[in-house]
Structures are given as C-alpha cells and as structure tokens.
Amino acid sequence: MKGLGLSTRTFNWSSLSSILLPRIPLATTKADSLILAVRHDKQVFSEDYRQVVDQYFETSPKKNDIRLFWNTQGFVRLAIVQLEENVSEKSVRSAAAEAAKILKSNGAKSIAVDGMGFPKDAALGAALATYDFSLRRDHLSVYQDEKVVEKENLFTSPAPERLTFQLLSNTSEKKTATAEENAFKVGLIEAAAQNLARSLMECPANYMTSLQFCHFAQELFQNSSKVKVFVHDEKWIDEQKMNGLLTVNAGSDIPPRFLEVQYIGKEKSKDDGWLGLVGKGVTFDSGGISIKPSQNMKEMRADMGGAAVMLSSIYALEQLSIPVNAVFVTPLTENLPSGSAAKPGDVIFMRNGLSVEIDNTDAEGRLILADAVHYVSSQYKTKAVIEASTLTGAMLVALGNVFTGAFVQGEELWKNLETASHDAGDLFWRMPFHEAYLKQLTSSSNADLCNVSRAGGGCCTAAAFIKCFLAQKDLSFAHLDIAGVMDKQLNSWDCDGMSGRPVRTIIEVARKY
C-alpha cells in the first residue's frame, strides 16, 4: 500500500476547505456601494439617480467610461458606467465587471448591481471579475473574523465571502421584480461554480492531491439529498482493470482514486438516460519519465482542470435544481518520475481489453481518460458523454486561448454544445473526429494502439484515441480539449490565474437535456 504523501502528514485539510467551499455571494443587508448603468443617450434604468447621472455626463464621458462618486445617494461609493449603444448580455457582463473591479479596489464590501435589463449577466460579470485566490499571509488575513491571524494556523476561522452582491431593482411590478431577482441569483450561482473550478485549479498540488480532491467532493455535497459521492480506492481500481490509471500512478507515492458523483435531478424512468461527465484528474503532471521542461511546470497543478470543471458543474446543477440526471467520474492521480514509474515502450491492457504501447509518458491523460470513458459508457445508460481535459499543447497551438476545441460525435450534441457556449458567452470551435487520425496510432507492432503519433495533429490524434474506448461506438460523445483556455484571460470579467472554463457551457448543456 502506498504512503499518504508529505502533504497529508503536514497539513490540516479542513482548514483550506473552509476557503475552497463555495458560498453564493448574495448580500443580505444594504450594500455599501452601487453600480449604476446609463445609456449613451443619457437614459437611465432608474430615474431615482437622475441627479448623479447628470453630474456624470457633465464630465463628457466616452463609451464604457466609469466614474466613481463618493458618499452620494445613500452609498459610500457609486460607480456609473456608460453602456454601448446596442445593449447585450455581453456588454452588460463587461460593464458590471469593469465597475465591480473599480469598486473592489476602492474598498467595497457589498455591491448593489444595476440589472441593466440582463440581471443574470450583471451578476455574472460582477462576481467573476472580482474573484481572486491566494495563500499569502496578508491575503488570508481578510478571511478572518479577527484582524490578527494566529501564527500557528493561518486558517483560524471559516472564510466568509469578502464581497457580496444584490440586485438594484428598477421596477415596482412584483412579478417582474421577482423574476429579475431570480435571474440575478442564478448568475451568482453560476459565477460561484466557475470560481470554484478556478480555486480547485489554483490550489497548490501538495494540497490538492487525489485524496484531498475526493475529500473536498464529499464535503461539498455532504448535506445534499440529490447528490451521491462514491470514492473508489486502489483495490477497486485494480478490480475494474483500469490499468491506464494504475500505470500513470505508478510513479507517485500518493495512491490513485476514482471519484464517481451522481446528481439525481429528476425521477428516473425507463426512457431517461444519464448525462455522462468525465474530467481529467491529474493533480500534478511532471510528464513522468518523459519529463517536461522546468519552465512553467508549476502550472501543471491545474492539469486536473477537467475534473474541477465537471465537479463545479455538478455543484451548479444541484444548487439550481436543474431537472437532469448526471453522473460525473474522474480518475485522480499524479504523473511523476520514479524507479517504479511507467517507461516508454511499456505495454498495458486497458479496461476494454485493448493493448496500448506507451511511447511517451507525458501523454498520460488519454490513458486514464480511456478507462473512465469506458467505465461511464458501459456502467450507465448514457444518452451522451462529455469529457473535458487539459490534454494537449497542440490545442493551444491550433486555437490559442480563444476557443475550447470540441471534438464531437453526434450532430444533436454538437448543436447543443454550440448553442450552450453561445448562451454562456463562451467560445467553442468544432474540431475533426476522423478515422485517419486513428490510423496514425495503430503503427505499433507490439500493441493495438500507441498513445502518441509522430505525424502531427496531436490534439486530433488524442481525441481519436479516447474515442476508441466508448462502450457504444455510436454514442453521442464530446471530447473538450481545454488546454488552451486553462489559464488565459479573454474577457473583461476574467481575471489573473486559472479560467474555470467551460463550466457555464456545461451547465447550459445540462439545461437542454
């Protein structure tokens, strides 16, 4: 039996989980600050603020200009932002984001947000743009109820949200006001889910191991009647013949885990199927024996980004009570070099019986995902399986940091993904699933498949490899390579660090099932 690893001997997990556990940042008391939007033609969503709006236009603002007013209209800080001529979901997200960042930098603790006609997007922009994560001592002090943090324990008290939001209602009509409040709260929940994915990806790898990721999942849903969490150990993994996961884990002192999370959002019937969600869970990827360059290797703490995205999506489904039955699985391990690590040239037999030659140990994600995809597509009656992974550097080369690369089998699933990504304000680009890429992986004389190809198109051959392990070959399936969008900032509501994309697209897809 493997050891538990240095981190579990020196670190009190429950301390950090108090910071990681999401909280819906909905303010319950009057806000100290306000975001107020005006149109280019000087129209304002609420005439109650006409006087300060007139002062704003006296400064001859340009489009998207933000002015900060102090101690006016009952608020300590009031930020006025001018919207674009054509108001849209995206422009509202952007306006709320920019204004919220200014208010936060000027000491705001609670912000009332003008709904601007799109209250959900106003909430998203404000809550996403003001996210941050740090384990610096001076940063951690803001989490505490007391002003002084004890030397012995940086996490002496539960971490409250440092910034909360409430909707500035612009209507006296009760039904409309309720609908706007509900939409605003949905935006905050979706933002909290994406921010959760960000935090899990940001968490240092000595804290976010396979064991601790599972511990966190159990904590996250411990009070939920709709979610069941199953943590499978090394013995179970061996019984399941998940040799891809066991082989990648061979170089690590921390044992692997296979996490299975069921969300029951509606009553089951004979005709209903599961929405299968699979996420890559490599908690740190050094490349193994085929070791990566040391520059920027620390970013590989986020190689479990697929697992973080899918777990956070399940959290959102549960919070929003979306009527769908979804199952999320992730194989969790580190990929490290050691005397017992897998070597180039090794041959293993996968869960579905196919033999695979390991030509490059840094192409480990597809090995563990192959077993996971086969498990979920064989053990569950799935109507579709969506897998997300920070899989290939080739994806960054192909699409940069703008689009998630989507390899999709099934036109209906692609249509749903494309529509969902548009609704979420995310960007997807369809990539080719073609048998020609698979042929490039069958050149080994020792095994059915090789885990890499020498012919280029690395993101395409990786997708073709994973597809081989579907239990039903015609099953609707999407492989989302999120390596390019893992930590790149694209919009004004993004911030430094990991992106948490594409959590909100997964939520939108689930709504359509």
From Swiss-Prot:
Cofactor annotation comment: Binds 2 Zn(2+) ions per subunit.
Name of the protein this chain belongs to: Putative aminopeptidase C13A11.05
Subcellular location, principal: cytoplasm
Localization terms from the record: Cytoplasm
Lineage of the species this protein comes from: Eukaryota, Fungi, Dikarya, Ascomycota, Taphrinomycotina
Active site: K292, R366
Keyword Cytoplasm tagged: yes
GO MF: aminopeptidase activity; manganese ion binding; metalloaminopeptidase activity; peptidase activity
Organism of derivation: Schizosaccharomyces pombe (strain 972 / ATCC 24843) (Fission yeast)
Binding-site residues, Zn(2+) 1: D285, D362, E364
The enzyme's E.C. designation: 3.4.11.-
Highest taxon of the lineage: Eukaryota
